[in-house]
Design a protein with these regions (language model features):
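Solvent-exposed, charged helical/coil patches
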Residues: 1-25, 98-105
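Basic, amphipathic alpha-helical patches used to engage nucleic acids or provide basic targeting signals
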Residues: 1-6, 30-97, 101
C-alpha cells in the first residue's frame, strides 16, 4: 500500500472524505481480496479508481474489475485528465452510480 496518494487521488479524496459527496461514506486505499482499491463505499458496493499511467495494462485491470464485480461491487474508473478537467462530470457519475446501486437494493 502506498503511503502517499498521488495528486489525482488526493483531489478525489478531498471530495469524498467526511461524507462530502452526497453523504456517501468512502474509505481510501482499502485492501479487498488481495487488491488495493483507491476508494470504496460499502453501503453502495461502489469502488472509485483514479487511473494514471500505471493503469496502461488494461488486461490486468479488467481481470481485477471482473473479480470485484463477482463480489458484488461496481467499479468506476476515471482517467487523471478527466478528474483534472471535468471534475463535475466525475462527481455526477459517482453520485448517479451510488443512486443506481441504492435503488437496486
Amino acid at each position: 500500500m502506498r503511503h502517499e496518494p498521488v495528486l489525482y487521488e488526493r483531489r478525489l479524496w478531498k471530495l469524498l472524505r467526511h461524507r462530502r459527496l452526497a453523504g456517501l461514506k468512502f474509505r481510501r486505499q482499502f485492501v479487498i481480496g488481495g487488491y488495493i482499491v483507491d476508494f470504496i463505499c460499502f453501503r453502495h458496493r461502489l469502488i472509485v479508481e483514479a487511473d494514471g499511467p500505471q493503469h496502461e495494462d488494461r488486461a490486468e485491470d479488467a481481470a481485477r474489475d471482473e473479480w470485484l464485480k463477482a463480489q458484488g461491487f461496481r467499479v468506476l474508473r476515471f482517467p487523471n485528465q478527466q478528474i483534472e478537467n471535468r471534475g463535475e462530470q466525475v462527481i455526477t457519475a459517482i453520485i448517479a452510480a451510488a443512486d443506481e446501486r441504492l435503488t437496486k437494493d
